[in-house]
Amino acid sequence: MKNEKKKSGIEPKVFFPPLIIVGILCWLTVRDLDAANVVINAVFSYVTNVWGWAFEWYMIVMLFGWFWLVFGPYAKKRLGDEKPEFSTASWIFMMFASCTSAAVLFWGSIEIYYYISTPPFGLEPNSTGAKEIGLAYSLFHWGPLPWATYSFLSVAFAYFFFVRKMDVIRPSSTLVPLVGEKHAKGLFGTIVDNFYLVALIFAMGTSLGLATPLVTECMQWLFGIPHTLQLDAIIITCWIILNAICVACGLQKGVRIASDMRSYLSFLMLGWVFIVSGASFIMNYFTDSVGMLLMHLPRMLFYTDAIGKGGFPQGWTVFYWAWWVIYAIQMSIFLARISRGRTVRELCFGMVMGLTASTWILWTVLGSNTLLLMDKNILNIPQLIEQHGVARAIIETWAALPLSTATMWGFFILCFIATVTLINACSYTLAMSTCREVRDGEEPPLLVRIGWSVLVGIIGIVLLALGGLKPIQTAIIAGGCPLFFVNIMVTLSFIKDAKVHWKDK
């Protein structure tokens, strides 16, 4: 019994370093918010301007990797000996469900405003040209390109899971073919895992920092409770307590049911917006935007604005590519887990088609609605953001729809459930990654899960205290830098091992 406890307890070398690093950064930030904002602006400017090109080339190279997987020698290789665990319809639905987080609802509702008010390519703000390129850029940032780049990592993890039968809970486990077992399980592997965990903690904290204001603004609209930082902190605390109760009482089945509810409610809410906002305009705008995307795609892929220095690619494209990089391992592990028995080609095509459809639907419907409200002078979004913040502006885009009270209740429930499941997933992923071997069917220790959910909650509160989107963007970009190299190493390790193992099969 004693040995079992030791086996399933924390792994000190990957538990304490991220905890200490993140704790110190939070303490330094809270100690002087003004100084922290100065540092944040400097870090953001340095990474995006000096190293932004690297993120763009990373995405382009990984896109070529997708074509190699689909049409290359491994295209028909099966990821596991079993038949697919899920039907194709269920598989695609699970992919869609993974895209309906509160952070996605945040960006989907407001992103187009930023693209129109500060457009790329030297276009005039709020001009016809800016509006034409607005949704096209959303389709670029959340379309086939980033999902194609996830294919390589998803295939890699599925290969290690189901072909090589490796128990992978941290990225270092996949690096044995590349650097050898000694280094993968030694100091080098520990450093890689700590980079991954610190970045993942900040990524999850930023998602919480985006989601929480949506819920508290909904509460203000529905119940008249003023939105303050204290209310944000109270709501996050309630979520953490609710998560702890669910874990302690064995209510994980209830959390899974809530996750399914989130998916169905997402369909319902998007369908409602599509119908009442203007289905004909949305379809016309989407069609036009696909054409604009195809016309400008080469420039979008390589756009750094080195001469004009308008800042658009640094503020958005580099930021989003870092966002995709930082979530790549976590998301790819999930996609690999649900893809057992699929061929490499099936997984690559399924991801690009299924996941692109989900994100394009979200951004097209929500972005078109926001644009219509601006064009019809129903909402003054710049004024709302200046006086009340971004979250209030997002809430008002939903409140402006017919049956506003019912719509707001639906949006409130959707955001609340999405954030509950987010915290549950955060605590589970971090606990699994920082504990010794946890067998199938077992849960990581309760206190470890609660501890990580508390830390993620603290990061969310700190980012909210800093105010604005820049701290959130900087946290993502800073976290994406080390994972940039980790993702490349995992990819190279897969290529090296598959070249030997799949050579004669």
Curated annotation (Swiss-Prot):
**Family matches, as NCBIfam families:** bcct, PRK03356.1
**What's an example Gene Ontology biological process for this entry?**
4-(trimethylammonio)butanoate transport
**Statement: the UniProt record of this protein carries the keyword Coiled coil:** no
Subcellular localization, as worded in the UniProt entry: Cell inner membrane
Question: What PROSITE patterns has UniProt attached to this entry?
Answer: BCCT
> Which gene name belongs to this protein?
caiT
What name has this protein been given in UniProt? L-carnitine/gamma-butyrobetaine antiporter
Known InterPro entries for this protein? BCCT_CS (IPR018093), BCCT_transptr (IPR000060), BCCT_transptr_CaiT (IPR023449)
Q: Name one GO cellular component term.
A: plasma membrane
Main location per UniProt? membrane
Query: Cytoplasm as a keyword?
Result: no
Report keywords, A-Z: Antiport, Cell inner membrane, Cell membrane, Membrane, Transmembrane, Transmembrane helix, Transport
Q: Which domain of life is it from?
A: Bacteria
Membrane topology type: Multi-pass membrane protein
Molecular function in Gene Ontology: (R)-carnitine:4-(trimethylammonio)butanoate antiporter activity
Natural source organism: Salmonella paratyphi A (strain AKU_12601)
